Amino acid sequence: MAKLTVSDLDVKNKKVLMRVDFNVPVKNGVIGDDNRVVAALPTIKYIIENGGKAILFSHLGRIKTEEDKKELTLRPVAQRLSDLLGKPVTFVPVTRGAQLEDAVNGMNDGDVLLFENTRFEDLDGKKESKNDPELGKYWASLGDMFVNDAFGTAHRAHASNVGVAEAMKADGKQVAAGFLMEKEIKFLGEAVDEPKHPFVAILGGAKVSDKIGVIDHLLNKADKVIIGGGMTYTFYAAKGMSIGNSLVEADKIDVAKEILAKGGDKIVLPSDSIVAEKFDNDVPNKVVEGDIPDGYMALDIGPKSVAEFKDVLKDAKTVVWNGPMGVFEMSNYANGTLEVGKFLGTLSDATTIVGGGDSTAAVKQLGVGDQLTHISTGGGASLEYLEGKELPGIAAISNK
């Protein structure tokens, strides 16, 4: 079902309430990575260039104490957004009340306003995170229409996405996806529901438990599922192989056995690993094939696995990659992840979609982002979408 998008709305002279995902790393008032702010620009610009008033709101981190508020204010984000837009952004340091209402009512067409971190509302009974209906209604009352561009929180039913959307729709107001949300739905949705074949999924990361649902769902859709990262060794254990001191989720070995039985030759596991005696970048390491020797732990896929994975990928028409092949944050164990990222950049005939923090970081480090079809901004949201789940934040957007 196609969703209403911001380009379907008549925003002129309208107060457009827009949920953005400005959950960026901030330390002592300095933003570490403004990627998510940049990703929201096309929708913000569309609203203001077409004569609308953009009222933005977002969460940032988790608020558990009054002290957290100082470190997790959105004020530095408003400043960064102002720099990126080249125009003033009014920052309102509250989440409700007369100060916010007056600021909204004083806006001119083309103005941009950002109000304070929605999770400030969590100090008093988790009103944001538990989707308090009164809070959703209050925020909805600030705008004439609602645009949700925060894919990163689409898997959560919070007051600032689902609550606002439901209240808006109950008032007969329009609820639409922003351009970023639209792009995520298009690429992730098409990759899973209407992929061009061969379709190869690459799933990495430390824990099988994080990816069980995704592996299970994608085995029904993909031609091959490549498994790398720490979770490899839970599968090794399920096959009765030796894993030395490698990471293993003992309580997931039976699940891994079921996945191997279901997947058969669709599943591609690493055939060799780079191992060391300690979880340390500076100790000697070596390449071993198959079983991991006693006293050693596997920290990356080996060169043979890299070559085999490339062989599986070379004819692919759709590739979805989520999760690193090894301990990416240690330079000696980043090679598997970097090699996969580099190779995806050469697949010019394929739709290539990357999600997850380490995979995205690898792509950036390599500078191959422009050669890929789509880099997803949602961590947990991407995974749940790849599991085939309906995400509440997306479900709440009006259909066309």
UniProtKB/Swiss-Prot annotation:
Cysteine pairs bridged by disulfides in the record: none
EC annotation from Swiss-Prot or TrEMBL: 2.7.2.3
Organism superkingdom: Bacteria
Any one GO cellular component localisation term in the record: cytosol
A GO molecular-function annotation: ATP binding
Subunit structure: Monomer.
Family: Belongs to the phosphoglycerate kinase family.
UniProt protein name: Phosphoglycerate kinase
Organism: Pediococcus pentosaceus (strain ATCC 25745 / CCUG 21536 / LMG 10740 / 183-1w)
